[in-house]
Amino acid sequence: MVMRMVFVENKINGVENIRQEIDNLNVSNYKEIYDKFKNVFSKNRDIFNYYVDKLIELMKNLDDNELSLEIDKFMLCILKDSIIWEFKAGGSVWDLSIKDIKDNIIILGCSNHLFALDIKTGNKIWEYKVEHNVDSLFIKDNIVMLEYRGGHVCVLDVMTGDKIWESKVGERMWGFSLKDNIVILGDGDKYIYAIDVRTGGKLWEFEAEWCVWELSIKDDKIILRCEDEYGCEYFYVLDIKTGEKILEFGGEWHVSDLLISGDVTILADMWGCVYALDTNLYSKIQRVRPQLTNIMKEIVKIDLTLLKKSLNLNEWDELPIQITNKSLKDITISKISIINEEDILFKDIEPIKIRGRDTKVINLFINPKVKGKLPIDIVVEFEDEFNIRYKERFTEVLTITKFKGDNVDDMRPEKIDKILKQEIDNLNTSNYKEIYSRFKNIFNENRAVFNYYMNKLIELVNNSNDELAINVGKFILDILGIKRVDELLWEFRAEGGVRLLSIKGDIVILGCVSGHVYAIDIKTGKKLWEFKAEDTVWGLSIKDDIVVLGCGNIFESIVMLKNGKILEEGYAYALDINTGREIWRSKIKHDVRSLSIKDDIVVLGCKKGYILALDINAGNMLWEFKAKSGKSIRNLSIKNDILLFGCDNYLYALDIDTGRELWRFKAEGEVKSLSIKKDNVLLGCRGGYVYLLDINTGEKMERFKVVGSVLRLSIKDDIVILGCNRECVYALDINAGENLWAFKTDGDVNGLSIKNDAVLLGCDNYLYALDINTGEEIWKFKTESAVLDLSIKDNIVISGCKRGHVYALDFNIIKNYSIIQKIKQVL
């Protein structure tokens, strides 16, 4: 016993002696000390850690960078020498999970294998192989749960590796969250699933409106954080046991974060406000609206009466339909379809509002190609004040008498147009209103004939005396108030939100969130070809007959995994504009966020502040530049040989041939948009800051301030149009520094273009045309979903929306509105 005590005492004294030597460590003896006590370090981790701490302290106190680097390399070497054990998995290890320390088991995922190792020795306890790469895993009690490609979930015994159950949940899954015996999984898109961890049975599933990129569990509630195409965040709160939606926040709330504590929900918005809500009470309030709309759906009914059951087509005839709103609520008729086996008429009308318990007569011009008694179905589509849509069908019999002596070909559209134009050619000051009344429904259907009529009216204004011109001018204004400019030339439905569009000749190129790329005939809306990229299309530009795409991960902040590796790369593609044939593709080491072209140079703005330049002919990289900030680059513009881009609070100017930095300018807010006018750069920033800079030097010439972040901007002469995120559009005179006008929209401005003296806006679910000089609304068009981008070619306005809708509108109807504005001024 005495001998053992002496041994322990000597051991303690030995350690203290070593510590004393280490305390004298310096730049000349640190290697010598390591060699002297290497064997002691391998057995005593405490004393080894003490040595490493002293090395780090020494390195921090050195002014010599080369010597510090030498010590740093030395530390890496000795740390490698101190490895306790090593295991070769045969591939990239992307996930580790440790069972309770007492069980001494570590689980690791590698490609399509799962290994269980002894944490002390590194010896393999068991191995399990699945069909595809394992994406995630976790351990609960005595089971290990893993998810592998294809949406498969598997549960194993953690001690033996034996399979307990396996189930296919969705198409693809990501991550796990666990509460009691309920596992919550996401599919990487909009679906969330709840699984019983004991049996593998699906308890429920929930579909969010937007892509879910983060979920957390608090007590018995699940919080989902979603993000739309603009990066705006939405939150759902679900009941973990049933999947029932308790709360939803987004849109008008502009929520930036959400927490739940007991019965209180805490919201923070992007304007710096924090709200505390009673969770249960607010949940009840949010449920009231669906209940009300269900009640409305039950009671909104209409009656339809055919007022004329026989049509004689010796003259242009109309079919009068009487519709009665039987409910107490107002409704809006949006479409009437009259169909039989011959599909005799498919008719769109301008919206007609019918108040509760009211009746209206609607006259429809009808042009059948058959005669006799026809059984027809009349389908009326309408919506109530809650925007709930309805469709009702009525069956009638209609008798048709044809033109005497005419054959079916006499009713060809081209003959109808010819007859109508002959009538319009006889337009004069006494019959112009009568002609409009007779052919109003035809005008609603036939844009070419309506434009022909409008041009004749304009000629009448120009050739009349002032008093008569004013009368005709008033009539024109009335027509434009009645006539919907939102009747479409065509509509196309893409797969995924249409983020970008570009026009070359008669071809419209669409780039989608889903990675789909379409070429559309601008005149007909017919699809010419389709291409599928690897990821979301963030950049799109056309040079000659080459379409160049920049693609990357749809998420801004989520790390994507592939085969256990962090997926950060993007892609650039070059396609033949006429065929869609892939000319080349280039794998980029960073996710692409923007794209522009100058001559044969393709410039890509990427995540983490990188700018890359590629050769347009082969896709080879020419140069690379790294901005000071690591944020994504979403704004690129090129003038002559100067490349301009915004990254965080800085605007950079580079030589486009070499990538050399020419100058940089620091703004007071994050750069959101930019535009070039002659030798000046206009900059729109977060916080409403607007700057005018000299393009050659970066010198600040003017500074303006508006409300809200400037998301879009465009310049016409000396007028700058600013589209902001607080549902406002501003016009500035850059010479006078004055605010000319402001216009309130129904959402953030995502598309902005100028055509002659009209400003075109894409905001939320609307397209607007505004007078650039006054800000007065010329027309407004409602879309099925939020407008993401717009462009105009000749007189055709193309808009792409978040749910894949693409609309083509004829701008020709208001090409003469400047004359109309003059009439208004006279009035």
From Swiss-Prot:
Organism superkingdom: Archaea
Name of one Pfam family that matches: PQQ_2
Keyword tags: Plasmid
Entry annotated with the keyword Ribosomal protein: no
Coiled coil regions in record: none
InterPro entries assigned to the protein according to its UniProt record, in alphabetical order: PQQ_b-propeller_rpt (IPR018391), PQQ_rpt_dom (IPR002372), Quinoprotein_ADH-like_sf (IPR011047), WD40/YVTN_repeat-like_dom_sf (IPR015943)
PANTHER family in UniProt: CELL SURFACE PROTEIN, OUTER MEMBRANE PROTEIN ASSEMBLY FACTOR BAMB
Protein name: Uncharacterized protein MJECL23
Lineage start: Archaea, Methanobacteriati, Methanobacteriota, Methanomada group, Methanococci
